[in-house]
UniProtKB/Swiss-Prot annotation:
A lipid is attached at residue 491 (GPI-anchor amidated serine). Gene3D superfamilies: Aldolase class I. It comes from Macaca fascicularis (Crab-eating macaque). GO terms for molecular function: hyalurononglucosaminidase activity. Residues 1-35 form the signal peptide. The active site is at 148 (proton donor). The keyword Lipoprotein applies. One of its GO terms (biological process) is penetration of zona pellucida. This is Hyaluronidase PH-20.
Length: 510
């Protein structure tokens, strides 16, 4: 894509002026055209797409002796309050410092109710104790702060969260009786947003300083607020005002070391609606990941559920997994966190249902989409980037061709993959996806996948594709070509110099 853009720019410039200065100027444009789109590198080597598990699955083994196959998940953690030292640690309102909120069911005020009324220092002192308790060792892992009671952006506290606006206005009126309601509202907005910002910012700074090897971020940040799917003509897009509000949260993105958006579904969303809903939420998160530094974006780990929010015992179908997990992979996120509550592991029956679902639907699909993504990365990017849709709003997915592959569950309970890709399979990847380089890597995009000799990718022990492809018939004078999407390598320079030499020679002969 970048090479084609450069080609058009170059030849338009050359036709207008045959001067050397024009050619040199165009030459200098090359790096900016070839390095526009980066992705965060894998946090674990050779794991370009990370699967994490954040559900209390230990109940199935501990209480009911029903082990679940977790071999495909790299990081794991239970959301239960008494579990520590995990790969995924989630901090709810009662587990990290003194989070102020108002219980909307009972009306009870906790820790002052609003951020203006809590002692920030007392909160940070307690937070330090909590972080050291839940993370006794600073291993690589996820640190997810799940504070959903109020939002740091004043305008986003709509009903029923407008109680935080009302309390803030009341506080200002008590302290400044001479102010009119509009004046008190303006002052309340300023004080609330400043206190909320300081509260969230200092908390994540503390976490990063104490446990720097963990990936710190807030659950549901960023959010797209594209929940208007009952309206006619729904296309999933985020409202412009919400995109602007996400831009205004740059102070939060600058201190986060990962983003944790959510793509939970309910039964009111059809497969088509769910696809549009998820697609735009993930796309917005990836956009936000580049706000701190476009050349060094934050990793995006998307929270997903296996069940619906309004029917917690009804599992997503395979089509709905494509709409959620498949969308996330095709758009170039760093990974997915599967979250679950006690409802899916609270009884022997629910554990058996979960085990069956994982064996027959979830794990085969994870194997399918992850191997396809890894194969595409190996073929197109030489494993130095990820494959991303050329048309973000298309329904192109990274899937194995069912005509050429068979994923089987063997008698011992392990999965195996049988089959190998064809050149046509690889060409389809090349037609519909492009290579987005990892940060700070020299990333080559293969121009002709017919030159691929073999594919060798694995995602777990024995879950691999290891296949030799028939070598292409080479004609004299047409060696394999690579497009270099980094401006720092010798091969790129030589490629461009050769083009310039040929053009100048042609002009000189006229």
């Amino acid at each position: 894509m970048g090479v084609l853009k450069f080609k058009h720019i170059f030849f338009r410039s050359f036709v207008k002026s045959s001067g050397v200065s024009q050619i040199v100027f165009t030459f200098l444009l090359i790096p900016c055209c070839l390095t526009l789109n980066f992705r965060a590198p894998p946090i674990i080597p050779n794991v370009p797409f990370l699967w994490a598990w954040n559900a209390p699955s230990e109940f199935c083994l501990g209480k009911f002796n029903e082990p679940l196959d977790m071999s495909l998940f790299t990081l794991m953690g239970s959301p239960r309050i008494n579990v520590t030292g995990q790969g995924v640690t989630i901090f709810y309102v009662d587990r990290l410092g003194y989070y102020p909120y108002i219980d909307l069911t009972t009306g009870v005020t906790v820790h002052g109710g609003i951020p203006q009324k809590v002692s920030l220092q007392d909160h940070l002192d307690k937070s330090k104790q909590d972080i050291l308790f839940y993370m006794p060792v600073d291993n690589l892992g996820m640190a997810v702060i799940d504070w959903e009671e109020w939002r740091p952006t004043w305008a986003r506290n709509w009903k029923p969260k407008d109680v935080y606006k009302n309390r803030s206005i009341e506080l200002v009126q008590q302290q400044n009786v001479q102010l009119s309601l509009p004046q008190a509202t303006d002052k309340a907005k300023q004080e609330f947003e400043k206190a909320g910002k300081d509260f969230m910012l200092e908390t994540i700074k503390l976490g990063r300083s104490l446990r720097p090897n963990h990936l710190w971020g807030y659950y549901l940040f960023p959010d797209c607020y594209n929940h208007h799917y009952r309206k006619p003509g729904y296309n999933g897009s985020c409202f412009d005002v919400e995109i602007k509000r996400n831009d205004d949260l740059s102070w939060l993105w600058n201190e986060s070391t990962a983003l944790y958006p959510s793509i939970y579904l309910n039964t009111q969303q059809s497969v088509v609606v769910a696809t549009l809903y998820v697609r735009n939420r993930v796309r917005e998160a990836i956009r936000v990941s580049k706000i701190p530094d476009a050349k060094n974006p934050l990793p995006v780990f998307v929270y997903a559920r296996l069940v619906f929010t309004d029917q917690v015992l009804k599992f997503l179908s395979r089509e709905e997994l494509v709409s959620t997990l498949g969308e996330t992979v095709a758009l170039g996120a760093s990974g997915i966190v599967i979250w679950g509550s006690l409802s899916i592991t609270r009884s022997m029956k629910s554990c058996l249902l979960l085990d069956t679902y994982m064996e027959t639907i979830l794990n085969p699909y994870i194997i399918n989409v992850t191997l396809a993504a890894k194969m595409c990365s190996q073929v197109l990017c030489q494993e130095q980037g990820v494959c991303i849709r050329k048309d973000w709003n298309s329904s192109d997915y990274l899937h194995l061709n069912p005509d050429n592959f068979d994923i089987r569950l063997e008698k011992g309970g392990k999965f195996t993959v049988h089959g190998k890709p064809t050149v046509e399979d690889l060409e389809e990847f090349s037609e519909k996806f492009y290579c987005s380089c990892y940060t700070n890597l020299s990333c080559k995009e293969k121009a002709d996948v017919k030159d691929t000799d073999a594919v060798d990718v694995c995602i777990a022990d024995g879950v691999c594709i290891d296949a030799s492809l028939k070598p292409p018939v080479e004609t004299e004078g047409s060696p394999p070509i690579f497009y270099n999407t980094s401006s720092s390598t010798v091969s790129t320079t030589m490629f461009i110099v050769n083009i310039l030499f040929l053009i100048i020679s042609s002009v000189a002969s006229l």
